[in-house]
């Protein structure tokens, strides 16, 4: 038997497809989402409908974003859900969730998007960064992710898991782990453990920055060289005297600073941009 084939569909490696089939896990995730009629729910990567069906049972409409042409077509012809489903066949990484919010006139209805999904593990981190651009249009997010990614999302300073993903996510959202999921809950079974996480965007940002570019810049530069002291890692942005004036320990490393610390550095850079730093240069994602 082909271990990658499930319900007549063969999982495609290039899409990072692993299909959820454990009923207990599915029930646990749906209970965590707690879908209600009248809400605007969006599922990313519905696949074969393991979450789609029980969520749609509890609501009157559901928008799904699916890249796989065959799966999108399958959902359009779902035997009993097709009238509830709005199937958008596109790459979620390129999708404008803000436009969806506007097109559905959710502001006038006093609503926001509720986003959930079993995210392809090969794009989960950049997809989360993409979704954070629309944090003010989103009520909450529930995602199945690689367990190690959930640990990073939930991490605290002074830990190995703490990194740029932690800071940028917690800058925008409250992060809560929901449940852990074994590989046997999927077909084909992934080689890693999984977990479900809940992200609730802050109604008011606890540590607002004047220019998000500088928060991206300073966190990227710090964590791309996380083994170095901040005195060295941030030497192109700050002098030692400037860091000291900002209450930063020169011997500290990237994981030792809180989100509030990074926000303070970003706001200083917004007011005092280094003359030799080009805003258009690409910030490489390469945490050590």
From Swiss-Prot:
Its main location: cytoplasm. It catalyses: adenosine(1518)/adenosine(1519) in 16S rRNA + 4 S-adenosyl-L-methionine = N(6)-dimethyladenosine(1518)/N(6)-dimethyladenosine(1519) in 16S rRNA + 4 S-adenosyl-L-homocysteine + 4 H(+). Keywords: Cytoplasm, Methyltransferase, RNA-binding, rRNA processing, S-adenosyl-L-methionine, Transferase. GO terms for molecular function: 16S rRNA (adenine(1518)-N(6)/adenine(1519)-N(6))-dimethyltransferase activity; RNA binding. The keyword Signal does not apply. It is found in: Cytoplasm. S-adenosyl-L-methionine binds at residues 18, 20, 45, 66, 91, 118. The keyword Glycoprotein does not apply. Belongs to the class I-like SAM-binding methyltransferase superfamily. rRNA adenine N(6)-methyltransferase family. RsmA subfamily. HAMAP family: 16SrRNA_methyltr_A (MF_00607). PANTHER family: DIMETHYLADENOSINE TRANSFERASE (PTHR11727), DIMETHYLADENOSINE TRANSFERASE-RELATED (PTHR11727:SF7). This is Ribosomal RNA small subunit methyltransferase A. It comes from Mannheimia succiniciproducens (strain KCTC 0769BP / MBEL55E). The lineage of its organism: Bacteria, Pseudomonadati, Pseudomonadota, Gammaproteobacteria, Pasteurellales.
